[in-house]
Amino acid sequence: MIQDKSKGAKQTLLERPWFLAVALAGLIGGAMLITSFIRATDNTLSLCSTAKNTAASIAKYTATPIQLQSIVHYATSHTVPQQSFEEISISLNVLKERLPCNFLVFGLGRDSLMWASLNPGGTTVFLEEDPEWIEAVLKDAPSLRAHHVQYRTHLSEAGRLLSTYKNEPMCLPAKAFPIRYNEKCPLALTSLPDEFYDTEWDLIMVDAPKGYFPEAPGRMAAIFSSAIMARNRKGDGTTHVFLHDVNRKVENAFANEFLCEKYKVNSVGRLWHFEIPNAANMTDQPGDRFC
């Protein structure tokens, strides 16, 4: 998220702070206008009919309050998301196919208003470990649904956790669920709000917690718990998991261990996109390993 910035190259969007406002405005009216125009012919009656249909379509469409707030926010701010346009587009394409959906985002930032506005009618929830940061973000975007999270891990423990988790039976995929009560596995997120456990998430974005200094929580538990929730999905379809900052060693290693290379369907910049089936559809997968 915005708060957890890497020291890499500057994002191209930083030079175009007006870009998201234009894009969001286009989402509201552009698709309907284009659809109407491509059907128009030189026939006068057809043109009149098309104009009437276009006006009716626009009149019927009502932007949600959070979409309108998002347009104004990004049109009047120099703050843009940390992710590049290409990275955002990967998630946006899935959102367009699945919305309205249940969208869980690890991390809260100046881009959170954008993510919520891209899921109109759906449920978008943000998890953040810094209570002061939550207060700062919600001051400008009070409509966001954000929860404070306390993690049990530290980035300095990543190597040990990765090499020893198999020694704890409750960390294995066959026994790790439900993670709400799984105190024996240090990678399980056990102290989250009820909404986290009671909702079946269609999309999960892991772009937090902090993971760039030893005392930080790291994203180990977020990645592990995302994999467990995806494997235990009860509804139809797969769970889409997006992991940002895969250029970092811990994110890369834990993604390969728990999200699995064979489920990776897209990769651009520092973002990996996984499409994970539930355990019932993993006919070739034993219960003692993830990949």
Curated annotation (Swiss-Prot):
Pfam families: IRX15_IRX15L_GXM
Recorded phenotype for the gene knockout or disruption: The double mutant agm1 and agm2 results in the absence of methylation on arabinogalactan glucoronic acid side chains.
GO molecular function, one term: glucuronoxylan 4-O-methyltransferase activity
Keywords: Golgi apparatus, Membrane, Methyltransferase, Transferase, Transmembrane, Transmembrane helix
Top EC class for this record: transferase
Membrane topology term: Single-pass membrane protein
Principal location class: Golgi
GO CC list: endosome; Golgi apparatus; Golgi membrane; trans-Golgi network
Gene3D superfamilies in UniProt: Vaccinia Virus protein VP39
EC assignment: 2.1.1.-
Transmembrane portions of the chain: 18-38
Subcellular location: Golgi apparatus membrane
GO biological process, one term: xylan biosynthetic process
InterPro entries: IRX15/GXM/AGM, SAM-dependent_MTases_sf
Reported function: Involved in the methylation of glucuronic acid of different plant cell wall component, but mainly on side chains of arabinogalactans.
Similarity comment: Belongs to the methyltransferase superfamily.
Name of protein: Arabinogalactan O-methyltransferase 2
UniProt gene name: AGM2
